A protein has these predicted regions:
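Ribosome-associated RNA-binding proteins
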Residues: 1-155
Length: 155
């Protein structure tokens, strides 16, 4: 993934090998070996174009409001390309002191029983499209979408 800045108002991001991109209206989608990510870039401030395996993001003027959306859009695009190519992984360690707790996956939820001695089990949602594995005292969260993987880890 390479980045090329034409001037202060336009940046071109080159799509990595093994990743394909499509732009339908305002929805940008990347497909790669680790999965597919898509996002709606509906912003009147930023213009997004996809040509020749490159995504060009541009703004009409260099004002603070425009540049904030400009660089945020570029960061989202870079994360989407990286997620489609390599994916994002979070590893969480289950630590229990005095009270032995158990963690198991049930459907689209993680159930934590006996957390700090509580009688009622805690349930945390697994965001759709996220793969979660529990191996001993390690929880592994995988997803091509960084936001979904991070939200599942936070839950």
């Amino acid at each position: 993934m390479g980045i090329k800045q034409d001037n202060g108002k336009s940046i071109t991001v080159t799509i990595s090998e093994g990743v394909t991109g499509t732009l339908e209206g305002t929805i940008l989608t990347f497909k790669g070996p680790k999965g597919e990510t898509s996002r709606d870039f509906l912003s009147p401030l930023v213009k997004t174009e996809l040509k020749n395996n490159e995504v060009t993001v541009s703004i009409p003027v260099s004002k603070r409001k425009y540049t904030r959306m400009f660089f945020t859009t570029i960061a989202h695009i870079k994360n989407m390309i990286e997620g489609a190519k390599e994916g994002f992984t979070y590893e969480l360690k289950i630590c229990s002191g005095h009270f032995p707790m158990t963690v198991k996956k049930e459907g689209n939820e993680v159930v934590i029983t006996n957390f700090l001695g509580e009688k009622i089990p805690r349930r945390s949602k697994i965001v759709e499209g996220v793969k979660l594995d529990i191996k001993g005292d390690i929880i592994i969260v995988n997803s091509p979408n960084i936001e979904d993987a991070g939200q599942t880890a936070a839950n």
